[in-house]
A protein has these predicted regions:
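N-terminal periplasmic accessory domains that precede
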Residues: 87-93, 138-141, 160-163, 175, ...
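C-terminal beta-signal and adjacent terminal beta-strands/loops
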Residues: 493, 655-664, 688-747
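Membrane-embedded beta-barrel scaffold of Gram-negative outer-membrane proteins
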Residues: 365-379, 478, 486, 522-577, ...
């Protein structure tokens, strides 16, 4: 399979033939000078085909015979729609949107977009997609999209985990504006630390990512792009409340200080104080929780000099309380009076991104990314403590330029990472330091028509992982109009933090067994894998309505993996290095179709074949459905008045096939579970009433079919006994949840 894939990658350029395109430059007027606009959106009206301008303000998009309305938009500027009847090179100058009475031709932007011209398979979820659901935090932002699977990690803490290509989030590089964010100590709960209202968009990259972003990515990358003080509303507030007792407040305050500086304060708070036990197992269905999350952003932009910069300062305090209904922490903490758990996290993040574009050579630029974080968690689960402090320093210097012409571009740079871990595990202390220095080079060739490739290589020296190379390759080919074929191959390597990544097993009676393999991290060797992938997308027009269909296939082949074995013994969770094969295969097919004006349908089917060599033999991955189906339908009415009022309706249906449940055959009969779960369906829906462009209210329901997993907690009647386990989760553990909220902004 690997040889065939590599042969395909080598032969692909031989099949290239030309395709007409529309290209150009987007500029703005700054003191009489035409300055390139970076990040402007360029797309064909009514389609999901779009691109974003680069640092030089340039773009290139396939010419569309079916739709000749090209839309150019950028926040703070009047949207422009051009009538393009033939391939050409154009220059668009944006104008400040200063007149609300101006008559402008508008077009609806797709909620989810995939570019035909990007080398990587990147799915972009913009604000329209994120507003289809409550999206209280990053972990809840993928419910309407099939690229990411979301489920509860256990039945005690109420934490959601995500999977991509059949692999859990430690194998996914999760970044915030391309700076690593959810890693190390934050793997278990870090997805809940980014409020949904802070998100401008999310980019999901399947398979091998860019060497510019490091060597740890194996399954793909999720990048969260935050709102910018310069373009966000001057004031924004979001109130949210649900019948499960969760209340939430989000407030944004932004101020443009002068022509170059802007700042914003983003304040988030959530609280749940109600104890509910709807399934009568004696445990709280959703943990009591409170969070205070404050972000201060500073944005600097000097178009005359070419300098831009962002400074971010964030403080987080998050507390959770879970366990039996009668648990009182002041009396029962770390005793057998009642089973309970408290997780208290404090976190500080400081980061900076600075970039410079050379005035006379717009194709040349450099950027510097730096960040520091201090993550401190104090936790206990029943009688077992788990504390971790993780301090991290990250820096990445990137230089962009060309080789002779703009068809041949490159990125080169240096990166540095430092991590210090201090853990207290049940009754032992463990500490380690990791540091790495790396250099990377990434070459991009684009013929300006229908073919491009990105070939990258990085070399790193790591005090634990040693010296190693990370190669990655991406190819893009447009065989005919409205289509794109992509292929990728790449290597990833990481050291596994087995305790913090698997904290859910503390909420059980399983003993932790770590097999010493002579490695330098918990006695285990680092994880290493190759990822191979290919995808094809074709847009179409049926009955006068546009749509697209796509198919992708990815293989992740582990050369070494830390096997987390919960099948060998139901009273243990064992960790050991892979002896044999571990392969994850993923196939996904998607159809997006515009049924009528403002009425969109999305259908997705996904198949997984994930297997690993365990001590018992080769087994399929536990608690992972081989088959999944998603259907999403979204409708919005025409504007009801000149203020932008309208109704929005959205519904998402998920069908999840049967899943293998880890063996409990040696347990007493009353504590045994079936070998496989039953398939189930889940339905989410939301209605939004937009009164004006500044004010809207919404009402929604999660799991409205009220499906609940049977026996989410094994031996809940004996939590200090040998068979207690809250980690056998394959479906929803809470019933239907109704929520409502409002959004208000002042520009």
């Amino acid at each position: 399979m690997k040889n065939n894939m590599l042969l395909l990658l080598l032969l692909l350029p031989m099949f290239i033939f030309s395709q007409n395109i529309v290209s150009g430059t987007v500029v703005e007027d700054v003191n009489g000078n035409k300055v390139p606009v970076y990040g402007a959106n360029v797309y064909w009206s009514g389609t999901s085909i779009g691109v974003v301008t680069n640092e030089e303000g340039k773009f290139s998009i396939p010419f569309s015979k079916e739709n000749n309305q090209l839309v150019i938009s950028y926040v703070g500027y009047a949207q422009q729609v051009l009538n393009i009847t033939e391939p050409q090179v154009i220059t668009i100058q944006l104008e400040v949107n200063s007149s609300l009475n101006e008559v402008v031709l508008t077009a609806e932007r797709k909620a989810t977009e995939v570019s035909l011209l990007d080398n990587r398979q990147i799915v972009t979820l913009n604000s329209k997609e994120l507003l289809k659901a409550a999206c209280c935090n990053l972990s809840e932002s993928f419910e309407t999209n099939a690229a990411i699977d979301v489920n509860f990690s256990d039945a005690v803490t109420g934490t959601k985990q995500i999977k991509m290509l059949g692999l859990t989030n430690p194998y996914i590089l999760i970044t915030q504006e391309n700076i690593p964010s959810v890693r190390g100590a934050s793997q278990a709960y870090g997805l809940t630390f980014t409020p949904g209202t802070w998100l401008e968009s999310i980019q999901i990259t399947k398979g091998a990512g860019s060497v510019v972003n490091g060597y740890e990515s194996i399954a793909g990358q999720i990048n969260a792009e935050l709102l910018k003080p310069l373009t966000d509303a001057a004031f924004f507030v979001n109130l949210y409340g649900s019948v499960d007792g969760r209340v939430e407040l989000n407030t944004h305050v932004n101020q443009k200080l002068n022509d170059r500086w802007s700042t914003g304060f983003y304040i988030h708070g959530n609280h749940r104080s109600w104890k509910k036990d709807n399934n009568d197992d004696g445990f709280i269905d959703a943990p009591l929780a409170s969070q205070v999350n404050i972000l201060n952003r500073w944005q600097y932009a000097n178009h005359e000099s070419g300098w831009v910069s962002f400074f971010d300062f964030r403080y987080l305090k998050d507390e959770k309380l879970a366990g039996e209904i009668g648990f009182k922490p002041e009396d029962d903490r770390l005793t057998t009076n009642a089973w309970g758990s408290e997780i208290a996290t404090k976190r500080i993040d400081v980061s900076n991104k600075t970039g410079y574009v050379f005035k006379d050579q717009k194709y040349k630029s450099f950027g510097l990314q730096t960040s520091y974080s201090n993550h401190d968690q104090k936790a206990y689960y029943g009688l077992r403590r788990y504390d971790i402090n993780h301090q991290s320093v990250y820096s990445n210097l990137i230089y962009n330029s060309i080789l002779s012409n703009t068809q041949n571009k490159f990125k080169a740079g240096l990166s540095f990472t430092y991590d210090q871990y201090d853990e207290y595990i049940i009754d032992s202390s463990v500490a380690r330091k990791e540091n790495s220095i790396g250099a990377f080079f990434e070459y991009t060739y684009d013929n300006g028509d229908n073919f491009s490739l990105v070939a990258g290589l990085r070399a790193d020296t790591h005090n634990i992982l040693g010296n190693f190379l990370t190669p990655r390759l991406h190819l893009r080919y447009n065989p005919w109009e409205g289509s794109v074929f992509r292929a990728s191959v790449g290597r990833g390597k990481r050291s596994a933090n087995i305790f913090t990544e698997n904290q859910r097993y503390f909420a059980s009676s399983r003993n932790f067994i770590v097999h010493n393999e002579g490695g330098k991290v918990y006695g285990l060797n680092p994880e290493e894998a190759w990822n191979y992938g290919a995808s094809f997308l074709q847009k179409f027009k049926v009955l006068g309505k546009r749509g697209d269909v796509s198919l992708d296939y990815y293989i992740t082949d582990f050369k070494n993996q830390i096997v987390v074995d919960v099948d060998q013994n139901p009273n243990e969770v064992q960790f050991y290095n892979l002896k044999g094969k571990s392969i994850a295969q993923s196939v996904q097919a998607d159809v997006n179709y515009n049924l009528a004006k403002h009425l969109d349908l999305r259908l997705s089917y996904k198949y997984y074949d994930v297997s690993t060599e365990y001590k018992k033999g080769n087994l399929t991955a536990p608690l992972l459905a081989k088959n999944r189906v998603l259907a999403n339908i979204a409708y919005q009415t025409h504007h009801l008045n000149e203020k932008g009022g309208r109704w929005k309706f959205d519904a998402t249906w998920n069908w999840v096939g049967k899943q293998r449940i880890p063996s409990t055959s040696v347990n007493p009969i009353e504590y045994q579970l079936p070998d496989y779960s039953n398939p189930f369906s889940k339905l989410n829906a939301q209605v939004t009433r937009v009164f004006t462009k500044q004010f809207e209210v919404y009402l929604g329901g999660e799991n409205v079919l009220n499906y609940k997993q049977d026996t989410p907690i094994l031996a809940a009647n004996d939590p200090f006994g040998s068979y207690f386990d809250s980690t056998m989760i394959y479906g929803p553990i809470q019933g239907a949840n109704i929520y409502a909220g409002l959004r208000l902004k002042i520009d």
